[in-house]
Structure formats: C-alpha cells, structure tokens
C-alpha cells in the first residue's frame, strides 16, 4: 500500500448509553474495534479529529493505522459510522482489525478520468452518467488499492463502460451481487438522443 492514514484513539472501560452521552458532551466519540484474533476493544476518539478524517475519501477506503494512547498501533479498516439525525456530529464508529493473511471484503472508490477529451463529450456533447461510484472487492490487505481508475478517453456518444472494460489491480476481485458479474459503470447520454430516436422511428413508418 503506497498511502496510509493514522488516527489517535484511547481505550475506554466505561460502556453504556449514559457513558456515551457523557463522552459526546466532552467532545469525544465512542467507538469499537473488532475482528481478528483479539477481543473487541472499546475506544474513544476526539470528535474534531475523526470528523475531519471522515471527510477524506481515503479514510473510507484505506487500511488505517490506529494509534492507541500508550504507543500501541493496530491496522484497522473503517466499517460503519453513525451520524446524528440532523447535526454534523459523529455518534459512533466501528472499525475492523486487519490481518495480513486474511482477505478483505470492502468497497473502493472509482476515479473517472479523461471524460472531457472523450469523443462522447467533445463530438457528441454527451453527459457522462456515473452509474457506479465504488466497487465491492476482495483482496489481501497489502494489495488494497486507494482507488480504481476508469478511463473514459475512448467513450463514444451513446456508449457505455462495463466492469469488463476496466482493468482491476493485481490480486483484486470484484464481488458480484445478484448474479451481475459485469455491471454498468458509466454511460454517455447524448442530449435529446431519446427524443430524436423516437422521431426518426416515426418518420420511417409507412403512411397509412
């Protein structure tokens, strides 16, 4: 992995709703780390630190270095975040431990490039629709990509990009859902194309 992020955590011994409310009033966030061979670990985080970290795409996709107060570091993956119903407040966070020899099942963001120079945009004035913005994948921790690139440079007006059209990084496999092994990734929608097609079809009908 070429890029990593770290965050600070403190082990907590007090649990329960009342304790969690006290933590939040003090600017802290209750969280838990689970998985691997160790027992689940209840931790607390600084709200401002985790709030700003969660605004970064890579914090949701990469293996993170969790630095526990006292010097111990563990590799973890963000699994879920609970937000306040109407305030910009992080209520609870779940992390999963990472074991080097155990495959990860996670989602990785897609980065779309070269749309502006594609024939679809330059020649046809198409609008690029991103049908998927992330992929559900499986890989070993050392092979987890920060993102997967989708090159739209050759896309034609009315054309599309499917999973089979992009190259997955080494050691990364796609997790198919519902039997769809080649999902639609992006499509070039030509403005007014549908209406024009219907008009052409009508013009081709023989007169009664």
From Swiss-Prot:
SUPFAM superfamilies registered for this protein in UniProt: Ribosomal protein L25-like
Record has Ribosomal protein as a keyword: yes
Keyword annotations from UniProtKB, A to Z: Ribonucleoprotein, Ribosomal protein, RNA-binding, rRNA-binding
Gene Ontology annotations of biological process type: translation
A Gene Ontology term for the protein's cellular component: cytosolic large ribosomal subunit
Gene Ontology molecular-function annotations: 5S rRNA binding; structural constituent of ribosome
InterPro entries reported for this sequence: Rbsml_bL25/Gln-tRNA_synth_N, Ribosomal_bL25/Gln-tRNA_synth, Ribosomal_bL25_b-dom, Ribosomal_bL25_C, Ribosomal_bL25_long, Ribosomal_bL25_short, Ribosomal_L25_dom, Ribosomal_uL5_bac-type
Subunit note: Part of the 50S ribosomal subunit; part of the 5S rRNA/L5/L18/L25 subcomplex. Contacts the 5S rRNA. Binds to the 5S rRNA independently of L5 and L18.
Function of the protein: This is one of the proteins that binds to the 5S RNA in the ribosome where it forms part of the central protuberance.
UniProt family annotation: Belongs to the bacterial ribosomal protein bL25 family. CTC subfamily.
Name of the protein this chain belongs to: Large ribosomal subunit protein bL25
Gene that encodes it: rplY
């Amino acid at each position: 992995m070429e890029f990593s992020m770290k965050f600070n955590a403190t082990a907590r011994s007090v649990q329960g709703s009342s304790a969690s409310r006290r933590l939040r009033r003090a600017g802290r966030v209750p969280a838990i780390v689970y998985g691997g061979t160790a027992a689940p670990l209840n931790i607390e985080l600084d709200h401002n630190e985790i709030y700003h970290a969660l605004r970064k795409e890579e914090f949701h996709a990469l293996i993170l270095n969790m630095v526990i107060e006292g010097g111990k570091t563990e590799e973890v993956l963000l699994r879920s975040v609970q937000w306040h119903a109407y305030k910009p407040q992080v209520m609870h966070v779940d992390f999963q431990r990472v074991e080097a020899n155990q495959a990860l099942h996670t989602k990785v963001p897609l980065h779309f490039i070269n749309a502006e120079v594609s024939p679809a945009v330059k020649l046809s004035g198409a609008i690029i629709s991103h049908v998927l913005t992330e992929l559900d994948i499986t890989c070993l921790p050392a092979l987890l990509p920060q993102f997967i690139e989708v090159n739209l440079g050759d896309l034609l007006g009315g054309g599309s990009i499917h999973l089979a059209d992009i190259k997955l990084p080494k050691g990364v496999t796609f997790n198919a859902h519902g039997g769809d092994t080649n999902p639609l990734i992006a499509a070039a929608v030509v403005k007014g194309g549908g209406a024009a097609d219907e008009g052409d079809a009508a013009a081709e009908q023989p007169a009664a």
